[in-house]
Amino acid sequence: MEIKSKMPGSIIEVKVSVGDNLEAGSLILIMEALKMKQEIRSQEGGVVKELKVNTGDRVSPGQVLAIIE
């Protein structure tokens, strides 16, 4: 499952690492968009296969942030 950005913004903090086991609703990262902090959470459980962003990165709408399997 790909976790994607819904709007442009900046990554404030990444809360997971590759290999972490997640439950549905687990916090993956925090981003700032439109001067507001937004929590990005997993829609379903799984294992973090890949992180596509780091703290401080700028992201665009539709950009893949992480891959969960």
From Swiss-Prot:
Keywords for the protein's UniProt record, in alphabetical order: Biotin, Cytoplasm, Decarboxylase, Lyase
Domain Biotinyl-binding: 1-69
Main location: cytoplasm
Localization per record: Cytoplasm
Positions bearing N6-biotinyllysine: 35
CDD domains associated with the record: biotinyl_domain
InterPro entries on file: Biotin_Carboxyl_Carrier/Decarb, Biotin_lipoyl, Single_hybrid_motif
EC assignment: 4.1.1.-
GO CC annotation terms, alphabetical: cytoplasm
A GO term, aspect molecular function: carboxy-lyase activity
Keyword Cytoplasm among UniProt keywords: yes
One matching Pfam family: Biotin_lipoyl
Membrane-spanning ranges: none
Protein's job: Biotin-carrier subunit of the biotin-dependent malonate decarboxylase multienzyme complex (EC 7.2.4.4). The carboxyl group of the carboxylated biotin carrier is released by the membrane-bound carboxybiotin decarboxylase MADB.
Protein name per its UniProtKB record: Biotin carrier protein MADF
Taxonomic source organism: Malonomonas rubra
Lineage: Bacteria, Pseudomonadati, Thermodesulfobacteriota, Desulfuromonadia, Desulfuromonadales
